[in-house]
């Protein structure tokens, strides 16, 4: 995200501004990048100043071909930031170009929670309970969080007392828990005196476009992410619309991966009709009508009173 994303109402007259700015969050972005081991190249003129911890992923033949084409257009491009260890880092092996990253990384170079945050937490004597699901946050007679009610792996309801409860359940799970924690004291859910919990949900949809070139570009060697272009990111009213987008240039992943990732659609998208799925999709803006709420009558698989919708 860029600083302008936090002030779209002020800058462009659409949606709403965030209650905080980019620079308030920037130290936390930097700490997360450090913990996950983000590779990249400092100095991108189209991005806020930051210092990746690791050298960028090599462009390879694919990136070199992209760069040649983008340079002919006169557009901005820069090696992408990517959470892949390009050298040994925090006990993880470096990327050795085993192939694309979607199926996972046997080398341990691709960052994921189980090899970044969890090992540090476990070494700090944190107890990690997996396959559990929190139903609601409990409060005491003073209206303060006192713990959580959750289901263990066997579906048994349990209570875990706590002095502090930290919510980190993403843009859908977090409001679900807050709304499901309604009580006589908090009839509309916890932390919801504004009525905005679950509102202004911002997702990150993205379309894909595939192309072909005549020469060999070794698309199967190395992580998919190669470079990005911020040429169209910031508002340029001469285009006839406000806001913009990032162009992310990647390596190909081959027919097997395309088939695997298309299973959710129930069919393999192909041919001239396939691009119709992507038309009109862009980054969501914060608007009250878009959000996560709790269904009044439908229960989830664990029997909770509401299900996010």
Model-predicted regions and their roles:
Residues 4-9, 89-90, 176-181:
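Short, solvent-exposed loop/turn and secondary-structure capping segments
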Residues 18-22, 28, 194-308:
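FAD cofactor-binding and catalytic pocket of flavoenzymes
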Residues 107, 123, 136-140, 148-221, ...:
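Glycine-rich loop(s) and the adjacent beta-strand/alpha-helix scaffold that form part
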Residues 8-134:
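Conserved redox-cofactor binding core of oxidoreductases
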Residues 4-8, 46, 305-309:
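Short acidic (Asp/Glu) and glycine-rich catalytic loops that position anionic groups and cofactors
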Residues 64, 141-146:
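A short, compositionally biased
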Residues 1:
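Conserved phosphate/anionic-ligand binding catalytic regions in large, soluble enzymes, centered on
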Residues 21, 73-75, 84, 89-94, ...:
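C-terminal lid/capping helical subdomain adjacent to the catalytic/cofactor pocket in oxidative enzymes
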């Amino acid at each position: 995200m860029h600083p302008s994303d936090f002030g779209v109402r002020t800058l462009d007259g659409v949606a709403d501004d965030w209650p905080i700015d980019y620079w308030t969050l920037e130290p936390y972005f930097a700490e997360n990048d450090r913990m996950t081991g983000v590779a990249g190249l400092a100095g991108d003129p189209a991005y806020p100043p930051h210092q990746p911890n690791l050298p960028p992923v090599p462009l390879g033949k694919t990136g070199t071909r992209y760069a040649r084409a983008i340079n002919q257009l006169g557009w901005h491009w820069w090696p992408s930031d990517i959470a892949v260890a390009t050298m040994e880092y925090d006990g993880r092996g470096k990327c050795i170009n085993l192939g694309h990253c979607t199926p996972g990384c046997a080398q341990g170079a691709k960052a994921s929670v189980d090899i970044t945050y969890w090992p540090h937490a476990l070494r700090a004597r944190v107890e990690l309970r997996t396959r559990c699901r929190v139903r609601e946050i409990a409060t005491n007679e003073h209206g303060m969080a006192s713990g959580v009610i959750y289901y263990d792996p066997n579906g048994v309801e349990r209570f875990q007392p706590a002095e502090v409860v930290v919510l980190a359940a993403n843009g859908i799970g977090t409001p679900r828990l807050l709304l499901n924690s309604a009580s006589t004291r908090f009839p509309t859910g916890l932390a919801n005196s504004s009525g905005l919990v679950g509102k202004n949900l911002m997702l990150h949809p993205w379309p894909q476009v595939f192309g072909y070139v005549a020469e060999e570009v070794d698309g199967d060697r190395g992580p998919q992410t190669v470079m990005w272009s911020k040429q169209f990111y910031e508002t340029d009213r001469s285009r006839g619309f406000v806001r913009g987008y990032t162009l992310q240039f990647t390596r190909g992943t081959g027919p097997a991966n395309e088939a695997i990732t298309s299973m959710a659609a129930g069919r393999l998208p192909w041919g001239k009709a396939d691009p119709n799925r992507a038309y009109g999709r862009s980054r969501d803006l914060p608007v009250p009508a878009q959000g996560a709420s709790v269904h009044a009558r439908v229960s989830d698989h664990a029997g909770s009173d509401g299900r996010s919708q």
